[in-house]
A protein has these predicted regions:
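Eukaryotic intrinsically disordered, low-complexity regulatory linkers and tails enriched in Ser/Thr/Pro
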Residues: 1-193
Length: 193
């Protein structure tokens, strides 16, 4: 399980070189015993329950990516707000969507990665201001925001991701290093399979 391995400091190369470890989304949930935990969905169709709060998982992920967890910037250099899209790398740009009702100070926002080879389909939920997100072969994920708002958040994250990639490719083009371009091509090919 990638999220648990990250917490133990395992090498990040295992994530990049193995497409089955690419993340679709993190959903905050409660264990049957009542503890705060995170449900992780992966591109290869796996769902795993990690007995760690999402705050710890995203903090470890940011540290492994070489980022300062509390100071993740937007693609235009501004410090991002709590629910604005966050880019951890060319393979991870998360949209924050409300996935559970608040209990104390527990995290209520799920993180949905827009840099995946799937399309998110948003449908009406069972109550007003709720929606279902359909992705891949997973069961529909209930979220506590209207379909219009969910689509807006996903589009906002996709725009952030496109801006990030555009700026990254501009910097690579300046380097004129064919090795860098080849490595990026291989990474993108693996991501889009």
């Amino acid at each position: 399980m990638m999220a648990a391995r990250l917490s133990k400091g395992e090498d990040l190369d295992l994530i990049y070189t193995n497409p089955k470890n690419h993340i679709v989304c993190f959903i905050p949930t409660y264990e049957p015993g009542g503890g705060d935990s995170t449900k992780c969905y992966f591109v290869d169709g796996r769902e795993e329950l990690v007995c760690l709060p999402m705050r710890i998982i995203t903090r470890e992920l940011a540290l492994q990516e070489g980022l300062r967890p509390n100071y993740i910037m937007t693609s235009d250099g501004r410090r991002s707000s709590y629910t604005s899209p966050k880019t951890y790398g060319p393979h991870l740009t998360f949209a924050h969507i409300k996935c559970r009702r608040p209990v104390g100070k527990d995290v209520v926002y799920g993180l949905f990665n827009v840099a995946i080879p799937y399309e998110y389909i948003v449908t009406e939920g069972p109550e007003p201001d709720t929606s279902y997100i359909h992705v891949g072969n997973f069961a529909p994920i209930l979220v506590y925001q209207s379909p219009r708002h969910v689509k807006h958040k996903l589009n906002e994250a996709m725009l952030e991701h496109c801006n990030y990639v555009r700026k990254m490719l501009a910097r690579i083009k300046l380097s004129q290093n064919p090795q860098v371009v080849a490595e990026l091509f291989i990474a993108w090919r693996d991501l889009t399979r």
